[in-house]
């Protein structure tokens, strides 16, 4: 069976860090994840997905990620139930996160300019080196991922007509 979840979204409230009686860290948080389509009014709707993360990852999330942070989460879906104080059975579906990654710099999130840069939850702030960076004039919003690189190293491809299927 396969139970894999990959989410990218913004944290809707600061993660809530607690500890179990066995001193295991557990953090709960909610992610706002945009849907891929627009509604009848031309607006994108979002799903608000409850998540839980355990142990060191929970402490790291609580220390580094705050409300509004763009993060990526990998994990699995879990359903559980419990009886509330009124004696009613309550069913909960949530994502149990195995790992997370911060997907933008803190300065970008706080509106201090600069673009997004992927960073690990445990990485310190980016280098404070004041070396100027070369400016790029890329109007294409889609990343290239090396599509323009010549996979044949500029050498001619040798194909005879007998090799072609048509």
Curated annotation (Swiss-Prot):
Q: Which Gene3D superfamilies match?
A: Nucleic acid-binding proteins
Q: Which GO terms describe its molecular function?
A: single-stranded DNA binding
Per UniProt, the short sequence motif Important for interaction with partner proteins occupies residue numbers 161-166
Q: Which GO terms describe its cellular component?
A: nucleoid
Q: Where is the composition biased (Low complexity)?
A: 128-144
Presence of keyword DNA repair: yes
Is ATP-binding a UniProt keyword of this protein?
Answer: no
Alphabetized InterPro entries for the sequence: NA-bd_OB-fold, Primosome_PriB/ssb, ssDNA-bd
Q: Give GO terms for biological process.
A: DNA recombination; DNA repair; DNA replication
Q: Quote the SUPFAM superfamilies the UniProt record gives.
A: Nucleic acid-binding proteins
Which cysteine residues pair off into disulfide bonds? none
Skewed-composition ranges (Polar residues): 118-127
Record keywords: DNA damage, DNA recombination, DNA repair, DNA replication, DNA-binding
Q: Report the residue ranges that make up the SSB domain in this protein.
A: 1-104
According to the record, the residues making up region (Disordered) are 108-166
Self-association and partners: Homotetramer.
Biological role? Plays an important role in DNA replication, recombination and repair. Binds to ssDNA and to an array of partner proteins to recruit them to their sites of action during DNA metabolism.
What protein name is recorded for this chain?
Single-stranded DNA-binding protein 2
Q: Which organism is it from?
A: Lactococcus lactis subsp. lactis (strain IL1403) (Streptococcus lactis)
User: Gene name on record?
Assistant: ssb2
């Amino acid at each position: 069976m396969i139970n894999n979840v990959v989410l990218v979204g913004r944290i809707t409230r600061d993660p809530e860090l607690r500890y179990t009686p066995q001193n295991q860290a557990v953090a709960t948080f909610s992610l706002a994840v945009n849907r891929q389509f627009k509604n009848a009014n031309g607006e994108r709707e979002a799903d608000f997905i409850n998540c839980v993360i355990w142990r060191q990852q929970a402490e790291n999330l609580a220390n580094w990620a705050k409300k509004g942070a763009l993060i990526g989460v990998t994990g699995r879906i879990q359903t559980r139930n419990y009886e509330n104080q009124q004696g009613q059975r309550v069913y909960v579906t949530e994502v149990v996160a195995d790992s997370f990654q911060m997907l933008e710099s803190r300065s970008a999130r706080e509106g201090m300019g600069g673009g997004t840069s992927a960073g690990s939850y445990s990485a310190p702030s980016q280098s404070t080196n004041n070396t100027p960076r070369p400016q790029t004039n890329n109007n294409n919003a889609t990343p290239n991922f090396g599509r323009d690189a010549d996979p044949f190293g500029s050498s001619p491809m040798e194909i005879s007509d007998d090799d072609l299927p048509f």
